[in-house]
UniProtKB/Swiss-Prot annotation:
Matches recorded under HAMAP family: ClpP
Quaternary structure and interacting proteins, as annotated: Fourteen ClpP subunits assemble into 2 heptameric rings which stack back to back to give a disk-like structure with a central cavity, resembling the structure of eukaryotic proteasomes.
Pfam family, one: CLP_protease
Protein function: Cleaves peptides in various proteins in a process that requires ATP hydrolysis. Has a chymotrypsin-like activity. Plays a major role in the degradation of misfolded proteins.
Cellular compartments annotated: Cytoplasm
Signal peptide: none
Protein source organism: Syntrophus aciditrophicus (strain SB)
Keyword Secreted: no
Any one GO molecular function term: serine-type endopeptidase activity
Keyword Glycoprotein in annotation: no
Main location: cytoplasm
Any Gene Ontology CC annotation: endopeptidase Clp complex
Record protein name field: ATP-dependent Clp protease proteolytic subunit
Length: 194
């Protein structure tokens, strides 16, 4: 069941009903509250590109509450965040796990934040393979390549040594907001909006 609240806004021309995500987009807010797959990534990318076309100099706010998801889908969002001109401020509400943690860290330096009770998780890419032995070998080499690529990106975003990233992502590595700040994934913890 997919419930999307509607909000009613009044202006000089009368009342207008918006789904909540469209209303947030008017304020340059993108909300990711699902696992990341190709469909979700395409929606996020379209919103980023739209907001850039609306005003290439005005900040975009990207709120995340996601368990992560597909690497290729997440990397498409990551690349778009880096590609567009407006700065993207990231905010974790709830959790930013796996690819979600990388997207959280990919926000504009100084504008990456989390609410106090957020949970951040980094780990190595997950993969399950089946098929012929040669195909499994190809898939295993690709997952190792992705592991190295994601480790390099995370090391760059957090200013952590690559060896530490590789060690910490060998297994699930959970962090509180405070630990994520110390790690370099976020820059601040937001208790109350100022």
């Amino acid at each position: 069941m997919n419930l999307i609240p509607m909000v009613v806004q009044q202006d000089g021309r009368g009342e207008r009903a918006y789904d909540i995500y469209s209303r947030l987009l008017k304020d340059r807010i993108i909300f990711l509250g699902t696992p990341i797959d190709d469909e979700v990534a395409n929606l996020i990318i379209a919103q980023l590109l739209f907001l850039e076309s609306e005003d290439p100099d005005k900040e975009i706010f990207f709120y995340l509450n996601t368990p992560g998801g597909h690497i290729s889908s997440g990397m498409a969002i990551y690349d778009t965040m880096r590609y567009i001109k407006p700065p993207v401020a990231t905010v974790c509400v709830g959790q930013a796990a796996s690819m979600g943690a990388l997207l959280l860290a990919a926000g504009e330096q100084g504008k990456r934040s989390a609410l106090p009770h957020s949970r951040i998780l980094i780990h190595q890419p997950l993969g399950g393979f089946q098929g012929q032995a040669t195909d499994i070998d190809i898939q295993a080499r690709e997952i190792l390549r992705l592991k190295d690529e994601l480790s390099l990106i995370l090391a760059d975003l957090t200013n952590q040594p690559l060896d530490r990233i590789k060690t910490d992502t060998e297994r699930d590595y959970y962090m509180t907001s405070q630990q994520a700040k110390e790690y370099g994934i976020i820059d601040e913890i937001i208790v109350k909006r100022s």
